[in-house]
């Protein structure tokens, strides 16, 4: 159900960190209510990239995306960036009006840079604000370091897994750092 207080969580996997020459290879979204209860999981889409684009990945990306199977999924995917953008937007429009949800995730500014470059209609769907879990992580690390051992990430570097971890991490900080 469409609600302007719902939150859109997003994660991208990319061939690298520079949107000037790296590309999106996976996108996933998840919608929660304002209290962080999951309402719906969106499509998880491998985004096709050419072999020449994939060959530009550094060793970390080759290892990580190869081990997870993402590289193989990208090679056989028929979804380009525009198709993935449109499918994601179609899902989000069922849950959140345009311009209402901040972009939510972990180090989400990096994802937004890629959205701006390769999926501008999706990027514009978000409010200009950010709900970045990494902000709380950095504050907790400095102001209450004793709680840092209480949350461990699996670090699969698969988009939906990363979103679920970001959400769980925010819930952890809400309970143990913000104490709400």
Swiss-Prot record:
Q: Name one GO biological process term.
A: DNA metabolic process
- Its EC number is 3.1.15.-
Q: Tell me where it resides.
A: Cytoplasm
Q: Where is the Exonuclease domain?
A: 7-170
Q: Name one Pfam family in it.
A: RNase_T
Q: Where is the signal peptide?
A: none
EC class (word): hydrolase
Q: Which UniProt keywords apply?
A: Cytoplasm, Exonuclease, Hydrolase, Nuclease
- On whether Nuclease is a keyword of this UniProt record, the answer is yes
Q: What does this protein do?
A: 3'-to-5' exoribonuclease specific for small oligoribonucleotides.
According to its UniProt record, which protein family does this protein belong to?
Answer: Belongs to the oligoribonuclease family.
* Protein name, as recorded: Oligoribonuclease
Q: Which organism is it from?
A: Pectobacterium atrosepticum (strain SCRI 1043 / ATCC BAA-672)
